[in-house]
From Swiss-Prot:
CDD domains in alphabetical order: Ribosomal_uL14
Coiled-coil residues: none
GO MF, one example: large ribosomal subunit rRNA binding
Gene from which the chain derives: rplN
Short name of any one Pfam family annotated for the protein: Ribosomal_L14
Protein name: Large ribosomal subunit protein uL14
Amino acid sequence: MIQQESRLKIADNTGAKEILTIRVLGGSGRRYAGLGDVIVATVKDAIPGGNVKKGEVVKAVIVRTKKETRRPDGSYIKFDENAAVILNSNGEPRGTRIFGPVGRELRDKKFMKIISLAPEVI
């Protein structure tokens, strides 16, 4: 359950380490975001020489949440951390590698490039 001011770790190699959520996309009054949802965020921590800089406003898709997500078969999935992958203007990942597992819900939301780069899809 990601909302405004939520901080997320970054699960790719763009150079950002942490982002802070500015807005959840998908409706004017939308409050929460879950797996596969797109957010607008600002980079709070980044490594020197990376593709993104601290203070940059980016779009990102959520790939892991601590809050459990219910699946259509009745099972639940949750992760140890909240994490996201930074997107470019076309909705594709800006990085070339994804670290850690990602939720299967990304396949339903048509983020196939992230699914193919991820080491594990749960």
